[in-house]
């Protein structure tokens, strides 16, 4: 039987739908939302369509701690995580280029207005 850690690692190797739970910046209440994550060069990122403001980004700017909920099909797991909102233009261009290509968006549009968060998992 495969260890849970191996299944989690394998699930993180490819992008899929995921939920994250953040802490509401004004209410302090947990806020859960479904998103898509990407594995780019071994790092985990969350992004979204361009052109919309997101409360989950504001929540992460206030408190970087979140729960990263893997929802299958390989494994289900609730992972404590840290989110780093990426604002550096060069880093955004590098990370968003393959996401934009996969989604059929103009890279410059995504760099200008898509959310982008790097997710790390504390030991």
List the model feature ranges, each with a label.
Residues 51-123:
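Short, structured beta-strand-loop surface elements
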Residues 15-49, 66:
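Short beta-strand segments
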Residues 1-17:
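Extreme N-terminal tail/first-helix region
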């Amino acid at each position: 039987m495969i260890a849970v850690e191996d299944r989690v690692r394998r699930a993180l190797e490819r992008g899929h739908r995921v939920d994250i739970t953040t802490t509401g910046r004004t209410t302090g209440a947990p806020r859960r939302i479904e998103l898509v994550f990407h594995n780019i060069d071994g790092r985990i990122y969350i992004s979204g369509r361009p052109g919309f403001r997101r409360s989950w980004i504001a929540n992460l700017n206030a408190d970087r701690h979140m729960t990263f909920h893997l929802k299958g099909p390989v494994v289900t797991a609730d992972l404590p995580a840290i989110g780093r909102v990426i604002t550096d233009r060069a880093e955004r261009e590098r990370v968003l280029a393959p996401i934009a290509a996969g989604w059929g968006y103009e890279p410059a549009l995504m760099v200008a207005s898509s959310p982008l968060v790097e997710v790390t998992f504390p030991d």
